Each structure stands twice: as C-alpha cells, then as structure tokens.
C-alpha cells in the first residue's frame, strides 16, 4: 500500500475545478487512501499562491482570469502546452519532508529535460523550480494538509509564453520564462514529455503505478464517497 500510486489523466480542465477536486480529495483522505498523481493542462489562467501580492501582476490581464490558490508561492501562469503534474501524497506514510518532495520534483524535471538533450537545467536552493541559464522552465508550488501534499509542478513545453510578460513570475522581478520547444531543435509536445516525466518521478519517489492510467471525472469529487 505504501508505494502504490494511482495515475489519472485529466486532459484539459479549468483550474478552479481541479483545485476544488484536489481539496476535497485531500480532506477525505484516510490512512489507507492510495496516493494519486494527476496529469493536466489548464486553459489560460493566472494563479496566485499564499505569498502573492498585487504588485506581482504588472498589467490588467484582459480575458485571462486571476484565481486565488491555496498553494505556496506567488503568481504564475498556466496555459495549453504546459504540462502540470499534481501530486497527492501521504508524506508521513512515505517518510518524506516537504523539502524532500520539492527536491524530488526538481530532480524529476532536470532528469526529464536531460533525456530530451537539455543538459544545463538546474535548481536553486532558495527558489523552488527549475532553471536553464537565467530563465525558468518549471514552477513548483505545494500545500501540505494533514501531512499530505497537493498541487505540484508546471513544466513549460510548447506554449504561448507571452502572458508571463504581464506578471512577475513567482514574484521575481524581470524573471524570464522559457520552454522545451525554445531550447530544443526537435519539436516535442506534452504527450512526448509526460511519459518520461512520470517514469522519472515514480523512480525517484519509489512509487508503483497501480495499473493503467485512469480517467478523471469532477463529479466523483462532489459526492460523499472517497474517490
């Protein structure tokens, strides 16, 4: 039970729906609830973490909604072509500290990028995420509730980066964002990357997939039963 993980493919889902579903899944967890990993892309949205402040949003975002989130960190942008991986893990059961999970997520992205010939990716001690040169390619934000994690990472693969110009990403003034398609001469999409991302994460975590990747239905998280 300890190492089992259910993988769910959400496709493209509104951030607000997934946020509520994550919260309800975590609230209803029991000691024997199997951990889950959710793979998703979001329609364009800015999300503000618990540490976000109004000055991090530089310009009026137009048609892109701004959503308050309960994750750690500051403001970021999600959009199609960015692979998001949410990790709902019982950290106590896995004997992991929050810093341990952040390190695993960072190593997951660095190793994944290396497999796609991006060999210079690195992490920073005081700024969770993954960087290439001076630019950021992956953002990480977590929340811990009852010893369990929710939220996760967002890896830029082949997306429109221009909305990042409307904010100070992660609260860092002048921070530029980059993506795999800009750094690699080979064209990759999220399908190419997600298989490697998942394999690397499970290897570092010591997790065992419980079987085929499962579908996800929002209504499952509205009833009173455990998903």
UniProtKB/Swiss-Prot annotation:
CDD domains the record matches: LipB
BPL/LPL catalytic domain residues: 31-209
Catalytic activity: octanoyl-[ACP] + L-lysyl-[protein] = N(6)-octanoyl-L-lysyl-[protein] + holo-[ACP] + H(+)
E.C. numbers: 2.3.1.181
Source organism (scientific name): Baumannia cicadellinicola subsp. Homalodisca coagulata
SUPFAM superfamilies: Class II aaRS and biotin synthetases
Disulfide bonds: none
Residues annotated as binding substrate: 71-78, 139-141, 152-154
GO cellular component: cytoplasm
Higher taxonomy: Bacteria, Pseudomonadati, Pseudomonadota, Gammaproteobacteria, Candidatus Palibaumannia
Note: In the reaction, the free carboxyl group of octanoic acid is attached via an amide linkage to the epsilon-amino group of a specific lysine residue of lipoyl domains of lipoate-dependent enzymes.
PANTHER family named among the record's database cross-references: LIPOYLTRANSFERASE 2, MITOCHONDRIAL-RELATED, OCTANOYLTRANSFERASE
Family under the similarity heading: Belongs to the LipB family.
Molecular function as annotated in GO: lipoyl(octanoyl) transferase activity
Subcellular location: Cytoplasm
Organism superkingdom: Bacteria
UniProt KW Transferase keyword: yes
Entry annotation: catalytic residues: 170
Enzyme category, top tier: transferase
Pathway entry: Protein modification; protein lipoylation via endogenous pathway; protein N(6)-(lipoyl)lysine from octanoyl-[acyl-carrier-protein]: step 1/2
Protein name, entry field: Octanoyltransferase
Gene3D superfamilies linked: Bira Bifunctional Protein, Domain 2 (3.30.930.10)
GO terms (BP aspect): protein modification process
Main location: cytoplasm
